[in-house]
């Protein structure tokens, strides 16, 4: 009888180095169903699943929703005195990407890496080349922590204003009746700085969202602006079976209710044939008017919502959690108290790196799942344009061949100009496959600021949280090894460093002359024998202690086992 590999793998002693002579290849789900891992997370440890609404549960259609926000913001600017010609602009989704930085001093849109090094610089619709960029940024570098000058446009809601800022700068720079200045533009005796223009745009965007007709127009045509996924009720019902589910949104109750009612508007329940359920029944806790990121700090007063009128009831809510009740305000501490959970019990799912992911992780220790809708297109380019990536690898090989037989004694200088030009051309072509600003995550070989934030703050990320449907709730999301250049470019072959390496490379922590070491330890022990300290030398651990990849906490597991045994007794 042949034992299946799934049975054999249950026993660690039977783990093979290869499978019947064939190298083991890790099974991976289809790319569009995948959840990607930055830090290992054991799903069976998660007791509560938290959701944001906008751009998470409710995904707004692109470019329709961005176009609506763009048009309404332009109309607002015109109503406060900006030129009527701006109404001719039409939102172009090919130009903006998230994670850009607006320089309020020079009016430039910047794409930067994690350290503030410039990757792309655009003034209006004009992309600046190296010499032009260095005129304003001599070191091609910005101080990212100068938040008074540099504003990061990180959210999906920022996309319309990102494009609008480019439109305004381009319009005022190239319109004959305005005179361009280094930090703004003039119209006769009137001067408008890029900083004040930026503030006008920010104020207009806020007005459109909070006082204008954006929400009203969205609700008038939900089918046009909001994605509806029939798998949503199924996933939430399965989450209900293994833990608690809660909703935390900055939106008010009336808007939330209409959006969520639409998302769950199916003739059946979680499965075809099952009875329809109201959206509130899928959540153990519902919080509106959350005011994130303040919600993850001191928060606001917790109040109860009258779901008939949408108004708030008088007084602070101090009672226990009641199923079906909708709350307003509160804080992340409130969530933990009402659900009886602690930080690492909670997996919070959202789209906003700062408002959802960074604050929930840094202040509460919640596990985090970042929704990145652009990932679908990024993966499409990564797979569909593989020939460009392969050509870059080939060019790198050609470059290495030119230097293959040269060392510090060589006077020969290989002509690498043609290879460099080709690398630049292929890299540019690759960037343009993503859009005018290139990939959300990289520019050539350099990762963007946005990519670094994803890796730093999101434990898991995917194009949609619906991808969790394709994993069991016992799944261990295990992070891959993040290789440094000396690991990713050096093959696993034995090299005797004593023969090959320079004598200057003397830091060896393993090849020790143990006889000499033991003698020195013996001498040291004799000289301080009267002191008798408990440990003279460290001992290598004999049990597994250096393990940080499995989302394990052995002490907690032992405590849980002890508690279960006590309950049985």
Curated annotation (Swiss-Prot):
Q: Which reaction does it catalyse?
A: a ribonucleoside 5'-phosphate + H2O = a ribonucleoside + phosphate; a 2'-deoxyribonucleoside + a ribonucleoside 5'-phosphate = a ribonucleoside + a 2'-deoxyribonucleoside 5'-phosphate; IMP + H2O = inosine + phosphate; GMP + H2O = guanosine + phosphate
Known regulation of its activity is:
Allosterically activated by various compounds including ATP, 2,3-BPG/2,3-Bisphosphoglyceric acid and Ap4A/P1,P4-bis(5'-adenosyl) tetraphosphate. Binding of an allosteric activator is a prerequisiste to magnesium and substrate binding. Inhibited by inorganic phosphate. Inhibited by inosine, guanosine, p-chloromercuribenzoate and NaF.
Q: Name one GO cellular component term.
A: cytosol
Instruction: Supply the EC number(s).
Output: 3.1.3.5, 3.1.3.99, 2.7.1.77
Residues annotated to bind Mg(2+): 52, 54, 351
UniProt cofactor note: Binds 1 Mg(2+) ion per subunit.
Gene Ontology BP term (one): dGMP metabolic process
Positions annotated as active site in the UniProt record? 52, 54
Which residues of the sequence carry a binding annotation for IMP? 52, 54, 202, 206, 215, 249-251, 292
Q: What is the protein name for this chain?
A: Cytosolic purine 5'-nucleotidase
The organism named in the record is Gallus gallus (Chicken)
